[in-house]
A protein has these predicted regions:
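Active-site substrate-binding loop specific to GH73 endo-beta-N-acetylglucosaminidase modules
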Residues: 55-65, 195-244
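Extended intrinsically disordered, low-complexity coil regions enriched in Ser, Thr, Gly, Ala
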Residues: 82-87, 97-104, 195-201, 209-213, ...
Length: 461
């Protein structure tokens, strides 16, 4: 009896060891899934302002109407808690929900299609076991006809969805392949940085050549040295992805600041270096309007020193120098040189003032900049409530003439449009007109066939 008791601790250890190993494996798998979800920046779209993580409810403006993000917590009543792994994979990589209905490509499943089976498995483990369920269902998306017919996305997918997962290029090194996988797949760089055609599909011939993201412009990040990031070093690219700014070149704002804040700064240095290595090899796409590198324009100017004269009674008649002196010079300095080792960036040698597309310059003045680092954060206030459309256009043009690309311009109408949320899209109207034309053509064909049949029948008689 005593001999049997001696073996009990050993037996307990043998039984416990596989369970502990399984727990460790599950934990490691969930941690890997969490890292991938961070790389994919899922939280950015699936979290409403001041809402619970991944509970959805964020309104995403698109050219076809506003799309409301869904709850992707493991809630069984409001989220994806009842999804099988295959259903999760189909939603992630094919844009098909568990009920068989199609998602809209505002959810970047065209990029997530590149994610490997193993990484989908890790993501599923994280979302099912590492995310807190939230039993709150967001309002449904209600798009205007004909885009409310989700089945139409099946045809769109046939035309534009490449459902093959990423395949490493054996001619490239491990770092390049890792960077290509992250950039093309989870990080979905092309979703924002590639222009789109009339049907809102990415133009593959212009991959990463720059595209509109609502009211912002996602710039060219190909290897072109003038229009893109070809003149950036790999170290500068890594610093930008990690910190959100590189002094003398650029600072993240708008959706890119969110991507840095929520996603990119949390990636390992090795992965950031891999992404940089890949981006440095993307085929260059040049914009003929760019005659020199967009971050090379301008120099310090002292004109604000001469702007401290009596202001006009009508604020809209203030000169650009006067607006700058009143609202900008306290941080960016009288000569536009910035301060604090680039924490307050110079306005020359800055992509915001060097591009011919001035949307980002206007949006920064309207909305400001907000992003964080591990140690601190940067906050530039927006002036949408302080400055009129004309004042913003005036100071914008003054900045371009003195610190940036003098060929670029800002118009009052442009400011008014961006302030209102961007130019209205005619895509819904065009789609409806196309349906009317198709119906008329089909009706004409049917009418012709019926008349032909009637004539044939008459001749027979």
């Amino acid at each position: 009896m005593n001999m049997s008791l001696r073996w009990l601790p050993l037996l307990a250890l043998l039984v416990a060891t596989p369970a502990a190993a399984a727990d460790n494996t599950d934990t490691a798998l969930q941690q890997r899934g969490q890292y991938l979800a961070t790389a994919a920046d899922c939280v950015a779209c699936h979290t409403a302002p001041h809402g619970q993580p991944y509970a959805g409810g964020l309104t995403v403006p698109t050219p076809i109407g506003s799309i409301i993000s869904t709850n992707i917590t493991p809630s069984k009543t409001a989220g994806i808690g009842n999804y099988t792994e295959q259903q999760f994979s189909d939603a992630l990589r094919k844009g098909i929900r568990a009920d068989g209905k199609h998602l809209y490509p505002a959810m970047p499943y065209t990029a997530y299609a590149q994610i490997t089976d193993d990484d989908v498995h890790a993501l599923y483990a994280y979302f099912m076991h590492g995310v807190a369920p939230v039993d709150s269902k967001p309002a449904p998306t209600r798009l205007p006809f004909p885009f409310n017919i989700r089945l139409s996305m099946a045809a769109w997918n046939l035309l534009f969805l490449d459902s093959k997962p990423f395949t490493p290029d054996p001619a490239k090194g491990a770092a390049w392949n890792r960077g290509a996988y992250l950039a093309r797949g989870p990080a979905h760089c092309s979703t924002c940085h590639t222009p789109r055609n009339l049907l809102m599909a990415e133009k593959s011939s212009r991959e990463l050549a720059g595209g509109a993201v609502g009211t912002w412009f996602a710039p060219n990040i190909t290897a072109d040295p003038t229009s893109g990031i070809g003149n950036w070093s790999a170290a500068e690219l890594v610093a930008y992805l990690k910190l959100g700014h590189v002094s003398g070149k650029a600072q993240a704002a708008g959706p890119m600041a969110e991507a840095v804040d929520n996603s990119l700064r949390h990636l390992t240095d090795g992965d950031l270096q891999a992404i940089a290595a890949y981006l440095k090899t993307v085929p260059p796409r040049h914009d003929p309007a760019d005659t020199r590198a967009v971050d090379s324009w301008g120099g310090p100017s002292a004109e604000p020193d001469m702007a401290r004269t009596a202001l006009p009674d009508d604020a809209d008649k203030m000169s650009g120098a006067q607006v700058y002196d009143a609202y900008c010079a306290s941080c960016h300095q009288a000569r536009g040189e910035g301060s604090f080792d680039g924490g307050l960036p110079p306005l020359f040698h800055n992509t915001a003032t060097g591009r011919t597309d001035t949307a980002n310059l206007v949006m920064v003045i309207l909305d400001g900049i907000r992003w964080h680092t591990d140690d601190s954060g940067v906050h530039m206030p927006g002036f949408a409530h302080e400055l009129s459309d004309r004042q913003i256009a005036t100071v914008g043009n003054w900045l371009l003439q003195h610190y940036g690309n003098p060929a670029a311009t800002v118009s009052v109408e442009q400011v008014r449009t961006l302030r209102a949320g961007g130019a209205p899209s005619h895509l819904v109207l065009l789609a409806r007109l196309a349906i009317i034309v198709i119906v008329l053509l089909l009706s004409a064909v049917i009418f012709w066939l019926l008349r032909r049949r009637k004539r044939s029948h008459t001749k027979t008689l």
